[in-house]
Curated annotation (Swiss-Prot):
Cofactor(s) essential for the protein: Mg(2+)
Known function: Catalyzes the irreversible beta-carboxylation of phosphoenolpyruvate (PEP) to form oxaloacetate (OAA), a four-carbon dicarboxylic acid source for the tricarboxylic acid cycle.
SUPFAM superfamilies documented for this protein: Phosphoenolpyruvate/pyruvate domain
Enzyme class: lyase
Organism: Caldivirga maquilingensis (strain ATCC 700844 / DSM 13496 / JCM 10307 / IC-167)
Pfam families in alphabetical order: PEPcase_2
GO BP, sorted A to Z: carbon fixation; oxaloacetate metabolic process; tricarboxylic acid cycle
Substrates-to-products reaction catalysed: oxaloacetate + phosphate = phosphoenolpyruvate + hydrogencarbonate
Name by which UniProt lists this protein: Phosphoenolpyruvate carboxylase
Matching HAMAP family: PEPcase_type2 (MF_01904)
Alphabetized InterPro entries for the sequence: PEP_COase_arc-type (IPR007566), Pyrv/PenolPyrv_kinase-like_dom (IPR015813)
EC number of this enzyme: 4.1.1.31
Length: 512
Protein backbone atom coordinates (compact mmCIF):
# COMPACT_ATOMS: atom_id res chain seq x y z
CA UNK A 1 0.00 0.00 0.00
CA UNK A 2 1.35 3.43 -0.93
CA UNK A 3 1.85 6.17 1.65
CA UNK A 4 -1.17 8.43 2.13
CA UNK A 5 0.29 11.90 2.72
CA UNK A 6 -0.70 13.82 5.81
CA UNK A 7 0.41 17.17 4.35
CA UNK A 8 -0.14 18.66 0.89
CA UNK A 9 1.61 21.94 0.10
CA UNK A 10 -0.39 24.11 -2.29
CA UNK A 11 0.13 27.19 -4.47
CA UNK A 12 -2.60 29.38 -2.98
CA UNK A 13 -1.88 33.13 -3.39
CA UNK A 14 -2.67 33.88 0.25
CA UNK A 15 0.72 34.87 1.66
CA UNK A 16 1.52 38.44 2.71
CA UNK A 17 5.30 38.20 3.10
CA UNK A 18 7.27 37.41 -0.05
CA UNK A 19 9.96 34.74 0.55
CA UNK A 20 13.54 35.94 0.10
CA UNK A 21 14.18 33.55 -2.79
CA UNK A 22 11.37 35.01 -4.94
CA UNK A 23 12.59 37.18 -7.81
CA UNK A 24 9.48 39.39 -8.12
CA UNK A 25 6.57 40.28 -5.86
CA UNK A 26 4.84 37.03 -6.72
CA UNK A 27 5.85 33.41 -7.31
CA UNK A 28 5.88 32.24 -10.92
CA UNK A 29 7.81 30.13 -13.42
CA UNK A 30 11.00 28.53 -12.12
CA UNK A 31 10.30 29.95 -8.66
CA UNK A 32 7.39 27.52 -8.40
CA UNK A 33 9.66 24.61 -9.33
CA UNK A 34 12.10 25.66 -6.63
CA UNK A 35 9.16 26.08 -4.26
CA UNK A 36 8.11 22.47 -4.87
CA UNK A 37 11.64 21.32 -4.02
CA UNK A 38 11.52 23.49 -0.87
CA UNK A 39 8.19 21.95 0.11
CA UNK A 40 9.84 18.53 0.29
CA UNK A 41 13.40 19.33 1.37
CA UNK A 42 12.93 22.22 3.82
CA UNK A 43 9.33 21.94 5.05
CA UNK A 44 9.07 18.13 4.96
CA UNK A 45 5.72 18.31 3.19
CA UNK A 46 4.80 14.89 1.85
CA UNK A 47 2.87 16.07 -1.21
CA UNK A 48 2.78 19.12 -3.47
CA UNK A 49 -0.25 20.17 -5.52
CA UNK A 50 0.81 21.34 -9.00
CA UNK A 51 -1.99 23.61 -10.00
CA UNK A 52 -3.22 23.86 -13.60
CA UNK A 53 -6.51 25.39 -12.46
CA UNK A 54 -6.82 29.06 -13.35
CA UNK A 55 -3.09 29.81 -13.33
CA UNK A 56 0.01 29.50 -15.48
CA UNK A 57 2.10 26.45 -14.68
CA UNK A 58 5.32 24.81 -15.87
CA UNK A 59 4.60 21.52 -17.63
CA UNK A 60 8.26 20.48 -17.33
CA UNK A 61 8.23 20.46 -13.54
CA UNK A 62 9.37 16.82 -13.16
CA UNK A 63 12.29 17.27 -15.57
CA UNK A 64 13.42 20.42 -13.74
CA UNK A 65 13.08 18.86 -10.29
CA UNK A 66 15.10 15.78 -11.20
CA UNK A 67 17.74 17.69 -13.18
CA UNK A 68 18.21 20.60 -10.77
CA UNK A 69 17.82 18.80 -7.44
CA UNK A 70 18.91 15.26 -8.28
CA UNK A 71 20.90 14.87 -5.07
CA UNK A 72 17.67 15.15 -3.08
CA UNK A 73 15.35 13.18 -5.34
CA UNK A 74 17.70 10.22 -5.77
CA UNK A 75 17.03 9.47 -2.10
CA UNK A 76 13.37 10.52 -2.08
CA UNK A 77 11.57 8.75 -4.90
CA UNK A 78 8.95 10.97 -6.51
CA UNK A 79 5.71 8.99 -6.63
CA UNK A 80 6.74 6.59 -3.86
CA UNK A 81 8.22 8.54 -0.93
CA UNK A 82 6.86 11.98 -1.83
CA UNK A 83 4.15 13.01 -4.26
CA UNK A 84 3.41 15.58 -6.94
CA UNK A 85 -0.32 15.78 -7.66
CA UNK A 86 -1.90 17.74 -10.48
CA UNK A 87 -5.00 19.86 -10.02
CA UNK A 88 -6.61 19.97 -13.44
CA UNK A 89 -8.90 22.66 -14.82
CA UNK A 90 -12.52 21.53 -15.12
CA UNK A 91 -13.26 21.46 -18.88
CA UNK A 92 -17.01 21.60 -18.20
CA UNK A 93 -16.63 24.94 -16.43
CA UNK A 94 -13.56 26.59 -17.91
CA UNK A 95 -14.07 26.38 -21.66
CA UNK A 96 -10.89 28.31 -22.41
CA UNK A 97 -8.84 25.76 -20.44
CA UNK A 98 -10.13 22.59 -22.09
CA UNK A 99 -6.90 22.10 -23.99
CA UNK A 100 -4.95 22.66 -20.76
CA UNK A 101 -6.91 19.77 -19.25
CA UNK A 102 -5.67 17.61 -22.13
CA UNK A 103 -2.13 19.03 -21.99
CA UNK A 104 -1.78 18.28 -18.28
CA UNK A 105 -2.80 14.65 -18.75
CA UNK A 106 -0.37 14.28 -21.67
CA UNK A 107 2.56 15.22 -19.42
CA UNK A 108 2.02 12.25 -17.08
CA UNK A 109 3.70 9.71 -19.43
CA UNK A 110 6.51 12.20 -20.00
CA UNK A 111 7.08 12.32 -16.23
CA UNK A 112 7.12 8.51 -16.16
CA UNK A 113 9.80 8.34 -18.87
CA UNK A 114 11.96 10.93 -17.10
CA UNK A 115 11.67 9.16 -13.74
CA UNK A 116 12.44 5.76 -15.28
CA UNK A 117 15.72 7.08 -16.69
CA UNK A 118 16.58 8.98 -13.50
CA UNK A 119 15.87 6.12 -11.09
CA UNK A 120 16.84 3.27 -13.40
CA UNK A 121 13.54 1.51 -12.77
CA UNK A 122 9.85 2.01 -13.61
CA UNK A 123 8.51 4.86 -11.45
CA UNK A 124 5.11 6.53 -11.74
CA UNK A 125 6.30 10.01 -10.79
CA UNK A 126 2.78 11.41 -11.27
CA UNK A 127 -0.27 9.18 -11.12
CA UNK A 128 -2.94 11.24 -9.32
CA UNK A 129 -5.00 14.17 -10.55
CA UNK A 130 -7.50 16.35 -8.69
CA UNK A 131 -10.69 17.22 -10.57
CA UNK A 132 -12.13 20.53 -9.23
CA UNK A 133 -15.81 21.43 -8.99
CA UNK A 134 -16.77 17.77 -9.15
CA UNK A 135 -20.55 17.54 -9.36
CA UNK A 136 -21.12 14.00 -10.67
CA UNK A 137 -19.42 10.64 -11.03
CA UNK A 138 -19.35 11.31 -14.76
CA UNK A 139 -16.74 14.05 -14.20
CA UNK A 140 -14.40 11.48 -12.72
CA UNK A 141 -15.19 8.73 -15.21
CA UNK A 142 -14.60 11.16 -18.09
CA UNK A 143 -11.18 12.10 -16.72
CA UNK A 144 -10.16 8.51 -16.12
CA UNK A 145 -11.34 7.30 -19.53
CA UNK A 146 -9.79 10.27 -21.34
CA UNK A 147 -6.44 9.32 -19.91
CA UNK A 148 -6.82 5.58 -20.50
CA UNK A 149 -8.29 5.77 -24.00
CA UNK A 150 -6.76 8.95 -25.42
CA UNK A 151 -3.46 9.55 -23.63
CA UNK A 152 -2.42 5.94 -23.04
CA UNK A 153 -4.71 4.33 -25.61
CA UNK A 154 -3.42 6.19 -28.65
CA UNK A 155 -0.41 3.86 -28.87
CA UNK A 156 -2.47 1.34 -30.82
CA UNK A 157 -3.62 3.87 -33.42
CA UNK A 158 -2.26 3.01 -36.88
CA UNK A 159 -0.72 5.98 -38.71
CA UNK A 160 0.22 4.10 -41.88
CA UNK A 161 0.51 0.51 -42.99
CA UNK A 162 2.16 -1.21 -40.06
CA UNK A 163 3.16 2.08 -38.40
CA UNK A 164 1.52 2.73 -35.03
CA UNK A 165 1.75 5.67 -32.67
CA UNK A 166 3.82 3.54 -30.30
CA UNK A 167 6.45 3.16 -33.03
CA UNK A 168 6.85 6.95 -33.02
CA UNK A 169 6.62 7.89 -29.32
CA UNK A 170 7.24 4.55 -27.60
CA UNK A 171 4.92 2.83 -25.16
CA UNK A 172 2.90 5.07 -22.87
CA UNK A 173 3.03 4.43 -19.13
CA UNK A 174 1.26 4.48 -16.78
CA UNK A 175 -1.77 2.90 -18.44
CA UNK A 176 -4.16 4.43 -15.93
CA UNK A 177 -4.31 7.14 -13.27
CA UNK A 178 -6.12 7.84 -10.00
CA UNK A 179 -8.70 10.63 -9.98
CA UNK A 180 -9.41 12.63 -6.82
CA UNK A 181 -12.78 14.42 -6.74
CA UNK A 182 -12.62 17.96 -5.33
CA UNK A 183 -16.14 18.69 -4.14
CA UNK A 184 -16.93 22.37 -3.55
CA UNK A 185 -20.63 23.27 -3.76
CA UNK A 186 -23.42 22.51 -1.30
CA UNK A 187 -25.48 20.29 -3.57
CA UNK A 188 -22.49 18.10 -4.40
CA UNK A 189 -21.14 17.97 -0.83
CA UNK A 190 -24.42 16.63 0.54
CA UNK A 191 -24.54 13.89 -2.08
CA UNK A 192 -20.84 13.15 -2.18
CA UNK A 193 -21.63 9.53 -1.37
CA UNK A 194 -23.59 9.04 -4.59
CA UNK A 195 -20.77 10.67 -6.60
CA UNK A 196 -18.29 8.25 -5.04
CA UNK A 197 -20.55 5.23 -5.51
CA UNK A 198 -21.12 5.96 -9.20
CA UNK A 199 -17.41 6.32 -9.85
CA UNK A 200 -16.39 3.27 -7.84
CA UNK A 201 -18.83 1.03 -9.72
CA UNK A 202 -17.16 1.94 -13.01
CA UNK A 203 -13.52 2.49 -12.05
CA UNK A 204 -13.28 -0.16 -9.32
CA UNK A 205 -10.33 1.52 -7.53
CA UNK A 206 -8.45 -0.27 -4.75
CA UNK A 207 -8.88 2.82 -2.59
CA UNK A 208 -9.98 6.42 -3.10
CA UNK A 209 -8.84 9.86 -1.99
CA UNK A 210 -11.60 12.48 -1.77
CA UNK A 211 -10.96 16.23 -1.50
CA UNK A 212 -13.47 18.28 0.52
CA UNK A 213 -13.36 22.04 -0.02
CA UNK A 214 -13.52 24.31 2.99
CA UNK A 215 -12.72 27.85 1.73
CA UNK A 216 -15.11 28.21 -1.19
CA UNK A 217 -18.12 26.86 0.73
CA UNK A 218 -17.36 29.49 3.39
CA UNK A 219 -17.42 32.21 0.77
CA UNK A 220 -20.56 30.87 -0.85
CA UNK A 221 -22.58 30.03 2.26
CA UNK A 222 -20.82 31.43 5.35
CA UNK A 223 -18.38 30.14 7.96
CA UNK A 224 -20.72 27.91 9.95
CA UNK A 225 -22.41 26.31 6.90
CA UNK A 226 -18.94 25.55 5.48
CA UNK A 227 -17.85 23.69 8.60
CA UNK A 228 -21.14 21.78 8.86
CA UNK A 229 -21.04 20.88 5.15
CA UNK A 230 -17.53 19.51 5.61
CA UNK A 231 -18.75 17.39 8.53
CA UNK A 232 -21.72 16.08 6.52
CA UNK A 233 -19.43 15.26 3.61
CA UNK A 234 -16.90 13.47 5.83
CA UNK A 235 -19.70 11.47 7.44
CA UNK A 236 -21.10 10.43 4.07
CA UNK A 237 -17.64 9.61 2.69
CA UNK A 238 -16.97 7.16 5.49
CA UNK A 239 -20.49 5.73 5.43
CA UNK A 240 -20.28 4.93 1.70
CA UNK A 241 -16.75 3.60 2.13
CA UNK A 242 -18.00 1.19 4.79
CA UNK A 243 -20.93 0.19 2.59
CA UNK A 244 -18.72 -0.49 -0.43
CA UNK A 245 -15.91 -2.09 1.56
CA UNK A 246 -13.55 0.56 0.19
CA UNK A 247 -10.84 2.48 2.03
CA UNK A 248 -11.35 6.22 1.51
CA UNK A 249 -8.79 8.83 2.55
CA UNK A 250 -10.25 12.35 2.80
CA UNK A 251 -8.34 15.56 2.08
CA UNK A 252 -9.54 18.86 3.57
CA UNK A 253 -8.72 22.19 1.90
CA UNK A 254 -8.01 24.45 4.87
CA UNK A 255 -6.47 27.95 4.82
CA UNK A 256 -4.87 30.24 7.44
CA UNK A 257 -7.78 32.45 8.60
CA UNK A 258 -10.73 31.15 10.66
CA UNK A 259 -13.03 31.76 7.69
CA UNK A 260 -10.94 29.44 5.52
CA UNK A 261 -10.11 26.83 8.18
CA UNK A 262 -7.84 28.52 10.76
CA UNK A 263 -5.03 26.16 9.75
CA UNK A 264 -1.75 27.85 10.58
CA UNK A 265 1.30 26.95 12.70
CA UNK A 266 -0.29 28.49 15.81
CA UNK A 267 -3.53 26.52 15.52
CA UNK A 268 -2.54 23.10 14.16
CA UNK A 269 -3.74 21.06 17.14
CA UNK A 270 -7.18 22.68 17.09
CA UNK A 271 -7.59 22.00 13.37
CA UNK A 272 -6.58 18.36 13.78
CA UNK A 273 -9.26 18.03 16.47
CA UNK A 274 -11.81 19.81 14.27
CA UNK A 275 -11.60 17.30 11.42
CA UNK A 276 -11.44 13.73 12.73
CA UNK A 277 -11.08 11.19 9.95
CA UNK A 278 -9.18 13.54 7.64
CA UNK A 279 -5.95 12.06 6.29
CA UNK A 280 -4.47 14.99 4.35
CA UNK A 281 -4.43 18.69 5.22
CA UNK A 282 -3.53 21.42 2.73
CA UNK A 283 -0.55 23.49 3.84
CA UNK A 284 -1.18 26.70 1.97
CA UNK A 285 1.35 29.41 1.15
CA UNK A 286 0.65 31.72 4.12
CA UNK A 287 1.24 28.79 6.49
CA UNK A 288 4.79 28.53 5.11
CA UNK A 289 5.75 32.14 4.37
CA UNK A 290 3.97 34.28 6.97
CA UNK A 291 5.44 32.44 9.96
CA UNK A 292 9.07 31.69 10.88
CA UNK A 293 10.39 28.72 8.88
CA UNK A 294 11.11 26.67 12.01
CA UNK A 295 7.56 27.21 13.31
CA UNK A 296 6.09 26.09 10.00
CA UNK A 297 8.41 23.06 9.83
CA UNK A 298 7.60 22.00 13.39
CA UNK A 299 3.88 22.28 12.69
CA UNK A 300 4.14 20.25 9.48
CA UNK A 301 6.17 17.56 11.24
CA UNK A 302 3.58 17.44 14.01
CA UNK A 303 0.90 16.72 11.40
CA UNK A 304 3.06 14.20 9.54
CA UNK A 305 3.72 12.28 12.74
CA UNK A 306 0.13 12.34 13.95
CA UNK A 307 -2.33 9.60 13.13
CA UNK A 308 -5.80 10.21 11.66
CA UNK A 309 -8.47 9.93 14.33
CA UNK A 310 -11.70 8.00 14.06
CA UNK A 311 -14.32 9.70 11.87
CA UNK A 312 -17.68 10.87 13.15
CA UNK A 313 -20.66 9.50 11.25
CA UNK A 314 -23.79 11.59 11.70
CA UNK A 315 -27.24 10.12 12.18
CA UNK A 316 -29.91 11.11 9.66
CA UNK A 317 -31.53 13.26 12.36
CA UNK A 318 -28.26 15.09 13.10
CA UNK A 319 -27.66 15.65 9.42
CA UNK A 320 -31.13 17.10 8.89
CA UNK A 321 -30.72 19.45 11.83
CA UNK A 322 -27.35 20.57 10.42
CA UNK A 323 -28.92 21.21 7.01
CA UNK A 324 -31.65 23.31 8.62
CA UNK A 325 -28.98 25.48 10.26
CA UNK A 326 -27.11 25.73 6.96
CA UNK A 327 -30.17 26.88 5.02
CA UNK A 328 -31.18 29.49 7.60
CA UNK A 329 -27.65 30.82 7.94
CA UNK A 330 -27.00 30.94 4.19
CA UNK A 331 -30.05 33.12 3.50
CA UNK A 332 -28.90 35.76 5.96
CA UNK A 333 -25.23 35.54 4.98
CA UNK A 334 -25.83 35.86 1.24
CA UNK A 335 -28.07 38.90 1.71
CA UNK A 336 -25.25 40.64 3.57
CA UNK A 337 -22.61 39.63 1.01
CA UNK A 338 -24.79 41.05 -1.74
CA UNK A 339 -24.72 44.42 -0.01
CA UNK A 340 -20.95 44.29 0.52
CA UNK A 341 -20.03 43.08 -2.97
CA UNK A 342 -19.30 46.51 -4.43
CA UNK A 343 -16.72 47.32 -1.76
CA UNK A 344 -15.25 43.81 -1.84
CA UNK A 345 -14.71 43.89 -5.60
CA UNK A 346 -13.06 47.30 -5.44
CA UNK A 347 -10.64 46.30 -2.68
CA UNK A 348 -9.84 42.93 -4.29
CA UNK A 349 -8.22 44.65 -7.26
CA UNK A 350 -5.96 46.62 -4.90
CA UNK A 351 -4.69 43.58 -2.98
CA UNK A 352 -1.23 42.33 -4.02
CA UNK A 353 -1.25 39.46 -6.54
CA UNK A 354 0.82 36.55 -5.30
CA UNK A 355 0.54 34.07 -8.20
CA UNK A 356 0.04 34.41 -11.95
CA UNK A 357 -3.67 33.73 -11.74
CA UNK A 358 -5.98 33.87 -14.74
CA UNK A 359 -9.72 34.66 -14.65
CA UNK A 360 -11.51 31.66 -13.21
CA UNK A 361 -15.16 31.07 -14.00
CA UNK A 362 -17.33 28.69 -12.00
CA UNK A 363 -19.07 28.85 -8.66
CA UNK A 364 -20.09 31.97 -6.73
CA UNK A 365 -16.53 32.00 -5.52
CA UNK A 366 -14.73 31.89 -8.91
CA UNK A 367 -15.59 35.11 -10.69
CA UNK A 368 -18.85 33.98 -9.30
CA UNK A 369 -22.39 34.97 -9.98
CA UNK A 370 -24.87 35.20 -7.18
CA UNK A 371 -28.12 37.20 -7.11
CA UNK A 372 -26.65 39.11 -10.05
CA UNK A 373 -23.48 39.84 -8.06
CA UNK A 374 -19.94 38.86 -9.05
CA UNK A 375 -17.22 38.30 -6.46
CA UNK A 376 -13.47 37.62 -6.53
CA UNK A 377 -11.71 34.48 -5.34
CA UNK A 378 -12.06 33.48 -1.70
CA UNK A 379 -8.65 34.78 -0.61
CA UNK A 380 -9.28 38.27 -1.96
CA UNK A 381 -12.84 38.17 -0.60
CA UNK A 382 -11.57 37.48 2.92
CA UNK A 383 -8.77 40.04 2.65
CA UNK A 384 -11.13 42.73 1.41
CA UNK A 385 -13.59 42.30 4.29
CA UNK A 386 -10.89 42.22 6.96
CA UNK A 387 -9.54 45.43 5.43
CA UNK A 388 -12.75 47.37 6.14
CA UNK A 389 -13.08 46.09 9.70
CA UNK A 390 -15.65 43.36 8.94
CA UNK A 391 -14.20 39.89 9.54
CA UNK A 392 -16.22 37.62 7.22
CA UNK A 393 -16.56 35.08 10.03
CA UNK A 394 -19.18 37.28 11.71
CA UNK A 395 -21.50 37.61 8.70
CA UNK A 396 -24.79 35.82 9.33
CA UNK A 397 -23.98 35.21 12.98
CA UNK A 398 -27.24 36.65 14.32
CA UNK A 399 -28.96 33.59 12.81
CA UNK A 400 -27.62 31.56 15.72
CA UNK A 401 -29.83 33.48 18.16
CA UNK A 402 -32.83 31.69 16.64
CA UNK A 403 -31.52 28.12 17.05
CA UNK A 404 -33.39 25.73 19.30
CA UNK A 405 -31.75 23.42 21.83
CA UNK A 406 -31.42 20.45 19.47
CA UNK A 407 -29.89 22.61 16.76
CA UNK A 408 -27.42 24.03 19.26
CA UNK A 409 -26.48 20.50 20.26
CA UNK A 410 -25.67 19.58 16.67
CA UNK A 411 -23.77 22.81 16.02
CA UNK A 412 -21.59 22.70 19.13
CA UNK A 413 -21.12 18.95 18.82
CA UNK A 414 -19.84 19.22 15.27
CA UNK A 415 -18.07 22.59 15.17
CA UNK A 416 -15.55 21.92 17.90
CA UNK A 417 -13.66 25.21 17.61
CA UNK A 418 -16.68 27.44 17.03
CA UNK A 419 -16.08 29.77 19.95
CA UNK A 420 -12.31 30.05 19.58
CA UNK A 421 -12.63 30.72 15.82
CA UNK A 422 -15.17 33.47 16.44
CA UNK A 423 -13.01 34.92 19.20
CA UNK A 424 -9.96 34.98 16.91
CA UNK A 425 -11.88 36.74 14.14
CA UNK A 426 -13.79 39.22 16.31
CA UNK A 427 -10.56 40.93 17.40
CA UNK A 428 -10.34 42.46 13.92
CA UNK A 429 -13.72 44.22 14.09
CA UNK A 430 -13.33 47.98 13.66
CA UNK A 431 -16.59 49.66 14.67
CA UNK A 432 -15.44 53.15 13.72
CA UNK A 433 -14.53 51.89 10.25
CA UNK A 434 -17.82 50.06 9.75
CA UNK A 435 -19.85 53.11 10.72
CA UNK A 436 -17.89 55.17 8.20
CA UNK A 437 -18.76 52.94 5.21
CA UNK A 438 -22.17 54.47 4.29
CA UNK A 439 -20.48 57.86 3.79
CA UNK A 440 -17.49 56.61 1.79
CA UNK A 441 -16.80 57.32 -1.88
CA UNK A 442 -18.95 55.24 -4.23
CA UNK A 443 -16.26 52.56 -4.67
CA UNK A 444 -16.42 51.63 -1.00
CA UNK A 445 -19.88 52.83 -0.03
CA UNK A 446 -22.08 50.30 1.73
CA UNK A 447 -25.77 50.91 2.29
CA UNK A 448 -27.09 51.71 5.76
CA UNK A 449 -29.37 48.66 5.48
CA UNK A 450 -26.41 46.33 4.97
CA UNK A 451 -24.43 47.98 7.77
CA UNK A 452 -27.44 47.54 10.08
CA UNK A 453 -27.36 43.79 9.37
CA UNK A 454 -23.61 43.64 10.06
CA UNK A 455 -24.11 45.50 13.35
CA UNK A 456 -26.79 42.97 14.34
CA UNK A 457 -24.23 40.21 13.80
CA UNK A 458 -21.68 42.07 15.92
CA UNK A 459 -24.26 42.52 18.67
CA UNK A 460 -24.92 38.78 18.49
CA UNK A 461 -21.29 38.11 19.43
CA UNK A 462 -22.00 39.56 22.88
CA UNK A 463 -25.42 37.93 23.17
CA UNK A 464 -23.93 34.53 22.31
CA UNK A 465 -21.29 34.97 24.98
CA UNK A 466 -18.27 34.83 22.69
CA UNK A 467 -15.20 35.65 24.76
CA UNK A 468 -13.26 38.29 22.86
CA UNK A 469 -9.88 39.27 24.26
CA UNK A 470 -9.03 42.94 24.57
CA UNK A 471 -7.32 43.99 21.34
CA UNK A 472 -3.57 43.52 21.52
CA UNK A 473 -0.95 45.60 19.73
CA UNK A 474 -1.42 43.75 16.44
CA UNK A 475 -5.19 44.21 16.45
CA UNK A 476 -4.91 47.91 17.36
CA UNK A 477 -2.35 48.36 14.60
CA UNK A 478 -4.69 46.61 12.17
CA UNK A 479 -7.57 48.93 13.13
CA UNK A 480 -5.36 51.98 12.63
CA UNK A 481 -4.27 50.72 9.22
CA UNK A 482 -7.92 50.14 8.30
CA UNK A 483 -8.74 53.76 9.11
CA UNK A 484 -5.75 54.96 7.09
CA UNK A 485 -6.79 52.75 4.18
CA UNK A 486 -10.32 54.19 4.14
CA UNK A 487 -8.96 57.71 4.37
CA UNK A 488 -6.57 57.04 1.48
CA UNK A 489 -9.35 55.73 -0.77
CA UNK A 490 -11.61 58.65 0.11
CA UNK A 491 -8.85 61.05 -0.94
CA UNK A 492 -7.80 59.03 -4.02
CA UNK A 493 -4.34 58.14 -2.68
CA UNK A 494 -4.47 54.70 -4.25
CA UNK A 495 -0.79 53.78 -3.88
CA UNK A 496 -1.03 54.56 -0.19
CA UNK A 497 -4.21 52.48 0.02
CA UNK A 498 -2.40 49.50 -1.54
CA UNK A 499 0.46 49.86 0.92
CA UNK A 500 -1.94 49.87 3.89
CA UNK A 501 -3.68 46.74 2.54
CA UNK A 502 -0.36 44.92 2.43
CA UNK A 503 0.57 46.12 5.91
CA UNK A 504 -2.76 44.80 7.24
CA UNK A 505 -2.17 41.43 5.57
CA UNK A 506 1.23 41.20 7.25
CA UNK A 507 -0.39 41.86 10.62
CA UNK A 508 -2.93 39.07 9.95
CA UNK A 509 -0.18 36.79 8.58
CA UNK A 510 -2.25 36.15 5.47
CA UNK A 511 -3.91 38.11 2.72
CA UNK A 512 -7.09 36.16 3.35
Amino acid sequence: MRIIPRTMCTQHPDYANVPQWVVNDFIKGDDEVYEAYMNYSIYDCQETMWDFEGKDVDIYVVRKLLENYGGFFINKVLGEDIYLTYRLPNPNVEASDRKIFAEALETIPMAYDLARVFYGKPVKAIFEVIFPLTSSSRDLIMTLRYYERIVAGKCSVELDDGLKVSDVIGEVEPKTIEVIPLVEDMESLVRIDSIIEGYVKVAKPQYLRVFIARSDPAMNYGLIPAVLLAKIALSRVYAIGNSLGLSIYPIIGVGPTPFRGNFNPRNVNNTLKEYPGVYTFTVQSAFRYDYPVDNAKDAINLINNSKPTEPVILSSDEEELALTIIRQYTDRYQAEVEGLANAVNYIAQLLPPRRTRRLHIGLFGYGRGFRGVTLPRAIAFVGALYSIGIPPEILGLSTLLKLNERQWGVLEGNYVNLWSDLSDAAQYICMECIEQLPSMKSELRVSKETIAMVLEDIKAIDELGVKVSSPGFEQRKHALLTKLFLESVNNSYINDAKAYLLDMAKVRRAIG
